[in-house]
């Protein structure tokens, strides 16, 4: 890792699948580091699934030592039960990096798509294609990992504004 680089962890939260992606940013240059998907056991009780997600996220943070984290804000759907469960997973995804002392920024899905593709209503396939262009060495095996890399790229582009917003609080 370049000593001037900032390492960013992007996260796409979900209870069934949580995508993560790590990039290094030096000035305006982006470099792929790693990505993956955390798959909590679907049949396990909720507490065990959340604990699994937490443990795996801490492992990713310890392994790759990011300096900042960014999380995609969740979409609220018509099913209150699904929204609540997603909110619980999102809480764990926000907690893990904060627990490790990382500043955590949040970005709306529309902003992530606009930052990466240029259109807020872009399809997941378009996001994945642009991630391949922006990070040629990236190898996301799932849409969740690709989305997490897109969140990291968005944070790389907006981190100055995010830092100013945190300082204003």
Swiss-Prot record:
InterPro entries: RNaseH-like_sf (IPR012337), RNaseH_sf (IPR036397), X-over_junc_endoDNase_Mg_BS (IPR020563), X-over_junc_endoDNase_RuvC (IPR002176). GO terms for biological process: DNA recombination; DNA repair. Mg(2+) 1 binds at residues 12, 144. It is an enzyme of class 3 (hydrolase). The keyword Transmembrane does not apply. Binds 2 Mg(2+) ion per subunit. Keywords: Cytoplasm, DNA damage, DNA recombination, DNA repair, DNA-binding, Endonuclease, Hydrolase, Magnesium, Metal-binding, Nuclease. The active site is at residues 12, 72, 144. GO terms for molecular function: crossover junction DNA endonuclease activity; DNA binding; magnesium ion binding. Its cofactor is Mg(2+). PANTHER family: CROSSOVER JUNCTION ENDODEOXYRIBONUCLEASE RUVC (PTHR30194:SF3). The RuvA-RuvB-RuvC complex processes Holliday junction (HJ) DNA during genetic recombination and DNA repair. Endonuclease that resolves HJ intermediates. Cleaves cruciform DNA by making single-stranded nicks across the HJ at symmetrical positions within the homologous arms, yielding a 5'-phosphate and a 3'-hydroxyl group; requires a central core of homology in the junction. The consensus cleavage sequence is 5'-(A/T)TT(C/G)-3'. Cleavage occurs on the 3'-side of the TT dinucleotide at the point of strand exchange. Homodimer which binds Holliday junction (HJ) DNA. The HJ becomes 2-fold symmetrical on binding to RuvC with unstacked arms; it has a different conformation from HJ DNA in complex with RuvA. In the full resolvosome a probable DNA-RuvA(4)-RuvB(12)-RuvC(2) complex forms which resolves the HJ. This is Crossover junction endodeoxyribonuclease RuvC.
